[in-house]
């Protein structure tokens, strides 16, 4: 895809590769690794031995399809079978059986798992890499204190520190520290070995007092001293096996297990050659670390940058799934031990099949996917969202940081992120900088490091050979890396010029001959979201960040349209998202319809099902439309059907519409947007949304609940859409309050509520008369639409624990309206403030009314000038019928390259269409336009153009809310907060000042009493509105004031208030 004839070529990797490769690594290596750790299990008398033979494990293909798993709320998983043997030691007999040990959820080719019918994705985590790190801090006297921190594989820390007298201490807790000699002795070294293995023995001898000599005289003494300090135990503990085990479990296992990566890091940092399979901390490591620390004290060696990516590791899907498997097998081990013991006690003959249960493995994975912070519900608003979600990197999660504890330095961009983590794409708010996104070409290496590709240059006798290599953050430190790319100019020119380059975390300008490596692609430093922004180099980084987040919130429209100005990455994103249907074989189309495409090839006939009105978890509509005709011959890889928000296999999130940047009667004040009614009536920004409503039927103590159409006491019009079973019919139009599923719940009535004839039946015949309560599924407010699907899911067993579920899917057609949010691709967002008739909109010199009016003041202060370039180039493209795909940073080829391109295209458009107003030399890019109401031209020329504008998921229908009555908080007795809880309008301190400023005393009193937390007044208001009397004034204080008084009382402060009598102005003191 990239590169030219003389140079090496490179293709953009698959965007789902990171997830999929991680899962493949788990199935290929991690599974066997964990199964082979499963120990041999013996009974108490050592007569029976149970073991697993992992060489012959087997994963079975799932019996259900992915789509069925979603609709039936099942897990798309594979059963795992392993051979197990039971050996009787006395007779040497062995019984071998193939046993089922559990289900492992599978990942599809898009990197997504389906658990309980929900699409889930596991995101990658960044952790501090295990190893040793040297740092220096100033103490309260301003003297540098050097420390060496050893981080274990579990995240436990052991700190070594050196004091003013050059004594070295190991800090075992925040308050306790012990001498390095005691720690080494407790780990098994004697004094002679310690002095032989260090570079500065005289320093170690200098702080060896008689007391210290006694402590390290023997290993037992050292362990006792260490235990005393570590566990803060007083007195004289006695050495025993249990004390050793406790120390092993609490200290050495948590803080001294380095793992494979930790061992490699410590070996390279301390110049050791300890074998890789030695994954625990050794006395030799401690002594080498102490030597380095002494060197630091005397100015030798370099300190570590904790935020450099070489000191971080990526915990991928493979690592997380492997950890869970280890946990599940540990639980299985306990189960097998218990079962063997039970079988022998009851004198039963065990078999491998009877000893093993599949519950530990299956439940461990289900709870991991359901509860783990790094396992998230897949965001499927549009194809871009889906693909970006799997490429997230998080500093949060178990073993990581939290939003509260992370400092500014961790959140900041580090030079080592270059080409690995996108400097732009991160979340806004408390997690800014803690959740990042992978750069396009980045990949995860064998040791959990992030690798980025570069071209290596060999310049000999003017003939340059090029080789591509992937470098980890620790390797590219020592190279001069130029920011050149594959779309470079002629090399003869480039050899003579200076180029920007990066060397050892610094950015320099150097001659071309000194360059060792260069980047391979202009987008190499950015994530997918940022790479879709044209002219990103002209935007402020904060606005680019907002744009890459807002593109993920774009709603797929009913009629999508390709962008006129793009970056060339749109096709790759659409293909890798899996949304379009792609031909897997070449052949001929036999027939197409909305549900399937039938293809004939290689003598076989294939039926390719299409997605029809599928609901995403953000309620957007996923739908595929065929793009091939009957009789057409197609090749492998050709697009058969477009999906949601794709056109011709390219990502199409919004629309190219005619925009003017000008103020209009204050209706675009503060980022508001004025639009034409054409956008409503022409279905330009119309989208479909599918909502799911469900109801469960349980078996109660009074009997089972019934689904029925015969619901007493309800009006017939509410039941008009139900079929004979009591479930809403497909295709029916439903309004708010309509019954979707009729359900009756049996309940026992009180004696007094029976009718006289029912009492007679009970008394004479003993017949129990039951009554039922109506518990129907009703359509909530704002849910009106067309019923497109009804599913009756019956779980196996049919018990009260597995209730039957009825799901009703309703499609809504939403046009754009006042209050909806729209945005461009440069962080320029706004809310629709008014919809004008087309005749009142400003119009161009050729009579076309504009579709949207933006505020020009939103551009200079926010410094997102890229929108102006896109706007003008879009106009030229629409007039010339061209599409542009522009790589960023084109200024490296010549100055003002972007402006020259835009002006030259506008000039050509004005020539070809014979419209001189398109490019007027006095004010290029601007044009004189007319007021639609009067027909007069506006005073100033205005920028007009065709940018790409998206409609976002934040829609007014989901936000607007009113409260008539609802729930109150228990403590303050004030209305709850939020639409989902039927909450009230917040009236805070400043709102009270505003009402006071207008002198509206009665409204203010209503707000603070009847409508809020005055319990008695609230009840009286209801009564008087029904009867029709005057609303009484509230007498005493509202509940939140009484609460304040009680809180003060708990602090021994009594609060009284005085009532002045209106008649004689006498003060009556009353307790509150």
UniProtKB/Swiss-Prot annotation:
Localization of this protein: Plastid, Chloroplast
In terms of InterPro entries, this protein maps to:
DNA-dir_RNA_pol_bsu_ext_1_sf, DNA-dir_RNA_pol_su2, DNA-dir_RNAP_su2_dom, DNA-dir_RNAP_su2_hyb_sf, RNA_pol_bsu_bac, RNA_pol_bsu_CS, RNA_pol_Rpb2_2, RNA_pol_Rpb2_2_sf
Keyword Transferase, does the record have it?
A: yes
* Pfam families the record matches: RNA_pol_Rpb2_2 (PF04561), RNA_pol_Rpb2_3 (PF04565), RNA_pol_Rpb2_6 (PF00562), RNA_pol_Rpb2_7 (PF04560)
Q: Which UniProt keywords apply?
A: Chloroplast, DNA-directed RNA polymerase, Nucleotidyltransferase, Plastid, Transcription, Transferase
Gene3D superfamilies from the UniProt entry: 2.40.50.100, 2.40.50.150, 3.90.1100.10, DNA-directed RNA polymerase, beta subunit, external 1 domain (2.30.150.10), DNA-directed RNA polymerase, subunit 2, domain 6 (2.40.270.10), RNA polymerase alpha subunit dimerisation domain (3.90.1800.10), RNA polymerase Rpb2, domain 2 (3.90.1110.10)
Look at the named UniProt entry and state the broad enzyme category this protein falls under: transferase
Gene Ontology terms for molecular function: DNA binding; DNA-directed RNA polymerase activity; ribonucleoside binding
> In which broad location class does this protein mainly occur, judging by the first location in its UniProt entry?
plastid
Q: SUPFAM superfamilies, alphabetically?
A: beta and beta-prime subunits of DNA dependent RNA-polymerase
Enzyme Commission no: 2.7.7.6
- Catalysed reactions, semicolon-separated: RNA(n) + a ribonucleoside 5'-triphosphate = RNA(n+1) + diphosphate
**Organism's domain of life?**
Eukaryota
Its BP terms in the Gene Ontology are: DNA-templated transcription
**UniProt GO cellular component terms:** chloroplast; DNA-directed RNA polymerase complex; mitochondrion
Role this protein plays: DNA-dependent RNA polymerase catalyzes the transcription of DNA into RNA using the four ribonucleoside triphosphates as substrates.
The record's similarity note reads:
Belongs to the RNA polymerase beta chain family.
- What HAMAP family is this protein classified in? RNApol_bact_RpoB
Oligomeric state and interaction partners are given as: In plastids the minimal PEP RNA polymerase catalytic core is composed of four subunits: alpha, beta, beta', and beta''. When a (nuclear-encoded) sigma factor is associated with the core the holoenzyme is formed, which can initiate transcription.
Q: What is this protein called?
A: DNA-directed RNA polymerase subunit beta
Gene transcribed to yield this protein: rpoB
């Amino acid at each position: 895809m990239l590169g030219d004839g003389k140079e090496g070529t490179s293709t953009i990797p698959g965007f789902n590769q990171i997830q999929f490769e991680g899962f493949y690594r788990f199935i290929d290596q991690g599974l066997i690794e964990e199964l082979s750790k499963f120990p041999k299990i013996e009974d108490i008398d050592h007569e029976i031995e149970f073991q697993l033979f992992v060489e012959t494990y087997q994963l079975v293909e799932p019996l259900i399809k992915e789509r069925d798993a979603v609709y039936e709320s099942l897990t798309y998983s594979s059963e795992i079978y392993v051979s197990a043997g039971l050996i009787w030691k006395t007779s040497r007999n062995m019984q071998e059986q193939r046993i089922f040990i559990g289900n492992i959820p599978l990942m599809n080719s898009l990197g997504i798992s389906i658990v309980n019918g929900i699409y889930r994705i596991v995101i990658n985590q960044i952790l501090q890499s295990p190893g040793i790190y040297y740092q220096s801090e100033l103490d309260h006297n301003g003297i540098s204190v050097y420390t060496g921190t050893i981080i274990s594989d579990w995240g436990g820390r052991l700190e070594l520190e050196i004091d003013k007298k050059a004594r070295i201490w190991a800090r075992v807790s925040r308050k306790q520290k012990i001498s390095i000699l005691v720690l080494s002795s407790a780990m098994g070294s004697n004094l002679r070995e310690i002095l032989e293995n260090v570079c500065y023995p005289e320093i170690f001898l200098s702080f060896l007092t008689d007391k210290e000599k006694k402590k390290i005289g023997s290993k037992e003494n050292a362990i006792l001293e260490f235990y005393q300090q570590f566990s803060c135990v007083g007195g004289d503990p006695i050495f025993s096996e249990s004390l050793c085990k406790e120390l092993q479990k609490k200290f050495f296992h948590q803080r001294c297990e380095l793992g494979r990566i930790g061992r490699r890091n410590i070996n390279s940092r301390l110049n050791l050659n300890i074998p890789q399979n030695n994954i625990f901390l050794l006395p030799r490591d401690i002594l080498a670390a102490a030597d380095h620390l002494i060197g630091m004290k005397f100015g030798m060696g370099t300190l570590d940058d904790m935020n450099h990516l070489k000191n971080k590791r990526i915990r991928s899907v493979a690592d997380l799934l492997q950890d869970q498997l280890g946990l599940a097998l540990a639980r299985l081990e306990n189960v097998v031990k218990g079962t063997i013991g039970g079988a022998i006690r009851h004198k039963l003959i065990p078999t491998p099949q009877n000893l093993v249960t599949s519950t530990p493995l299956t439940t461990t994975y289900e709870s991991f996917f359901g509860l783990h912070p790094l396992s998230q519900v897949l965001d499927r608003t549009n194809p871009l969202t889906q693909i970006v979600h799997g490429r997230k990197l998080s500093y949060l999660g178990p073993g990581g940081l939290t939003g509260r504890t992370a400092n500014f330095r961790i959140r900041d961009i580090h030079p080592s992120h270059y080409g690995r983590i996108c400097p732009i794409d991160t979340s806004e708010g408390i997690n800014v900088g803690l959740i990042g996104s992978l750069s396009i070409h980045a990949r995860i290496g064998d040791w959990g490091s992030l690798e980025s590709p570069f071209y290596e240059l060999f310049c000999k006798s003017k003939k340059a050979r090029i080789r591509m290599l992937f470098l980890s953050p620790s390797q590219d430190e020592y190279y001069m890396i130029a920011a050149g790319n594959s779309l470079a100019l002629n090399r003869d020119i480039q050899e003579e010029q200076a180029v920007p380059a990066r060397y050892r975390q610094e950015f320099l300008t150097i001659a071309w001959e000194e360059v060792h490596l260069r980047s391979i692609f202009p987008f190499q430093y950015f994530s997918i979201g940022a790479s879709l922004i044209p002219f990103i180099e002209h935007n402020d980084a904060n606005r680019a960040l907002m744009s890459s987040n807002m593109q993920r919130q774009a709603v797929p429209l009913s009629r999508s349209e390709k962008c006129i100005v793009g970056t060339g990455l749109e096709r790759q994103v659409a293909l890798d998202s899996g949304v379009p249907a792609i031909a897997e074989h070449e052949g001929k189309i036999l027939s197409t319809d909305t549900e399937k495409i039938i293809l004939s090839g290689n003598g076989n006939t294939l039926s390719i099902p299409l997605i029809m009105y599928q609901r995403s978890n953000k309620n957007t509509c996923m739908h595929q439309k065929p793009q091939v005709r009957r009789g057409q011959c197609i090749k492998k890889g050709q697009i058969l059907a477009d999906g949601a928000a794709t056109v011709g296999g390219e990502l199409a999130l919004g629309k190219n519409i005619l925009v003017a940047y000008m103020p209009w009667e204050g209706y675009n004040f503060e980022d508001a947007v004025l639009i034409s009614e054409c956008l409503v009536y022409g279905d330009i920004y119309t989208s479909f949304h599918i909502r799911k409503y469900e109801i469960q039927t349980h078996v109660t103590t009074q009997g089972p609940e019934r689904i029925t159409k015969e619901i007493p006491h309800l009006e017939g019009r509410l039941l008009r859409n139900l079929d004979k079973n009591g479930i809403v019919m497909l295709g029916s139009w439903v309004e708010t309050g309509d019954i979707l599923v009729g359900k009756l719940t049996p309940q026992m009535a009180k004696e007094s509520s029976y009718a006289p004839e029912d009492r007679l039946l009970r008394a004479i015949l003993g017949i129990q008369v039951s009554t039922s309560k109506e518990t129907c599924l009703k359509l909530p407010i704002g849910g009106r639409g067309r019923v497109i699907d009804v599913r009756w899911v019956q779980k196996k067993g049919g018990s009260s624990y597995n209730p039957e579920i009825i799901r009703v899917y309703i499609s809504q057609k939403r046009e754009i309206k006042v209050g909806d949010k729209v945005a461009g691709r440069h962080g320029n967002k706004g809310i629709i403030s008014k919809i004008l008739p087309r005749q009142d909109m400003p119009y161009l010199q050729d009579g076309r009314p504009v579709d949207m009016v933006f505020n020009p003041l939103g551009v200079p202060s926010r410094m997102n000038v890229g929108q102006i370039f896109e706007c003008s180039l879009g106009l030229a493209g629409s007039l010339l019928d061209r599409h542009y795909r522009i790589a960023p940073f084109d200024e490296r080829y010549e100055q003002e390259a972007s402006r020259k391109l835009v002006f030259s295209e506008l000039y050509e458009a004005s020539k070809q269409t014979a419209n001189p107003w398109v490019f007027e030399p006095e004010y290029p890019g601007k044009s004189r336009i007319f007021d639609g109401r009067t027909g007069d031209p506006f005073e100033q020329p205005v920028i007009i153009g065709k940018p790409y504008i998206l409609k976002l998921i934040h829609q007014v229908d989901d936000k607007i809310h009113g409260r008539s009555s609802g729930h109150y908080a228990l403590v303050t007795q004030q209305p709850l907060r939020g639409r989902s809880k039927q909450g009230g309008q917040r009236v805070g301190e400043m709102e009270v000042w505003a009402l006071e400023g207008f002198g509206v005393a009665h409204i203010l009193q209503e707000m603070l009493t009847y409508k809020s937390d005055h319990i008695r007044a609230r009840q009286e208001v209801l009564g008087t509105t029904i009867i029709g009397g005057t609303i009484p004034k509230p007498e005493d204080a509202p509940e939140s004031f009484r609460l304040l008084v009680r809180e003060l009382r708990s602090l021994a402060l009594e609060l009284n208030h005085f009532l002045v009598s209106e008649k004689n102005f006498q003060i009556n003191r009353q307790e509150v």
